[in-house]
């Protein structure tokens, strides 16, 4: 979902699907949701309510893709990350596309 931020990148689902290893994927669903239905096995699970406290767990060496189950939490998480992380870091909210994975 584009928010108008300069840090948001357009999302190319086909490219992402083939190159997930090029991204740090942050899954902001609750831990119980992730255990029940993992989507990306190499994703970092940081539930949205814990995100501000656990920012240091997110590597900054790759673009960041943020997702939840449907888009609401990932939009909020993307805004938090955009405000807290370096300006040159690409952050993409893939929440609205997650059901295609």
Region roles according to the model:
Residues 1-24, 28-101:
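Rhodanese-like catalytic fold shared by cysteine-dependent sulfurtransferases
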């Amino acid at each position: 979902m584009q928010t108008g931020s300069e840090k948001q990148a357009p999302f190319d689902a086909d490219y992402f699907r083939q190159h997930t290893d090029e991204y740090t994927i942050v899954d902001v669903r609750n831990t119980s949701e992730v255990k029940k239905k993992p989507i990306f096995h190499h994703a970092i699970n940081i539930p949205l309510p814990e995100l501000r406290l656990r920012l240091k767990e997110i590597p900054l060496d790759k673009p960041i893709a943020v997702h939840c189950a449907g888009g609401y939490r990932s939009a909020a998480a993307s805004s938090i990350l955009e405000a807290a992380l370096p300006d040159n870091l690409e952050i993409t909210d893939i929440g609205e596309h997650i059901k295609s994975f």
